[in-house]
Amino acid sequence: MLDKHGRKINYLRVSVTDRCNLRCVYCMPPEGIVKKEHDNIMRYEEIFKVVKSASLLGVNKIRFTGGEPLILKDIDKLIYNTSKINSIKDIAMTTNAILLEDMVEELKKDGLKRVNISLDSLKEDRFKSITRGGDINKVFKSIEKSLSIGMKPIKINTVIMKGINDDEIDDFMNLTKKYPISVRFIELMPIGEGRKLYEDSYISSEEIISKHSDLIPVETDKSSTALLYKFKESKENIGFISPMSCKFCSGCNRVRLTSEGTLKPCLHSEKEVDLKNYVDSSQALLSKINETIYNKPLEHHMIEEKESKSKKMMYQIGG
């Protein structure tokens, strides 16, 4: 469907849980996280009702996120049932891949089309530091398994932070020369824990691109959040997602469902609508989703204000 600004909204990002098995420095605090009661988190059946209703309004792309989505007990069932909705053409997942190796083959059979893997360092000790305890070898094994079963495309999402991992930019880029893997560099955002790092660690996509004159621009879909490039010898693309230096609001085609059941028309807006009160009435749920999508804000003002209006952490909204 179209929002009131004429944008076609066909993409729903679904945070299935706010829980995670890592504690990445820009996403979650190291401690003090209060686990929400199950009654305050959407159940699998409720999530599916929202997905089904959104599909009736023209949503044909679904991405499951977290927290860490593979923690959800019914994630396989959710993917399978979503794949049976005829109008849904693309089912993707963003994961830290710690649990992916043993699950990816069955998830692919269930209907998962592609995965984005959050990976902010290729160095074992640094990865452990950034994630506060993660085992990078589990991620590497998950990538290998995903490649071996033909999961494609596989994209690596890397948040670049000055003085923390920016010395690995070339190493990440070179992955696209060796493997059929895309890499996405994401600008650090002043949201949640990222606010504490932003002033010292933000680095713009433009700064990275300017240092790599051999990058070749690739034609990009209008609704894409990434500007795409590749090297002459690349097997896949290198993307730059630049919410701070080059916002993509004019072509935005997505809304987000949080694990608490609120629908956010914009990641960086305070506005959100609680859908949990409507899931028992299909018509009321459809109407409320329709209304929220139609009233999606024209744009965010994070570039000018240097801060997201969202009061939630990224793990609560969905990465």
Curated annotation (Swiss-Prot):
One of its GO terms (biological process) is Mo-molybdopterin cofactor biosynthetic process. Gene3D superfamilies: Aldolase class I. Pathway: Cofactor biosynthesis; molybdopterin biosynthesis. Its cofactor is [4Fe-4S] cluster. It comes from the Bacteria. PROSITE patterns: MOAA_NIFB_PQQE, RADICAL_SAM. The keyword Nucleotide-binding applies. Keywords: 4Fe-4S, GTP-binding, Iron, Iron-sulfur, Lyase, Metal-binding, Molybdenum cofactor biosynthesis, Nucleotide-binding, S-adenosyl-L-methionine. Binds 2 [4Fe-4S] clusters. Binds 1 [4Fe-4S] cluster coordinated with 3 cysteines and an exchangeable S-adenosyl-L-methionine and 1 [4Fe-4S] cluster coordinated with 3 cysteines and the GTP-derived substrate. It is an enzyme of class 4 (lyase). S-adenosyl-L-methionine binds at Y26, G67, S118, M189. GTP binds at R13, R63, T94, K155, R254, V255, R256. Residues 4-219 form the Radical SAM core domain. GO terms for molecular function: 4 iron, 4 sulfur cluster binding; cyclic pyranopterin monophosphate synthase activity; GTP 3',8'-cyclase activity; GTP binding; metal ion binding; S-adenosyl-L-methionine binding. [4Fe-4S] cluster 1 binds at C20, C24, C27. [4Fe-4S] cluster 2 binds at C249, C252, C266. Disulfide bonds: none annotated. Its EC number is 4.1.99.22. It catalyses: GTP + AH2 + S-adenosyl-L-methionine = (8S)-3',8-cyclo-7,8-dihydroguanosine 5'-triphosphate + 5'-deoxyadenosine + L-methionine + A + H(+). HAMAP family: MoaA_B. Catalyzes the cyclization of GTP to (8S)-3',8-cyclo-7,8-dihydroguanosine 5'-triphosphate. Belongs to the radical SAM superfamily. MoaA family. Monomer and homodimer. This is GTP 3',8-cyclase. It comes from Clostridium botulinum (strain Okra / Type B1).
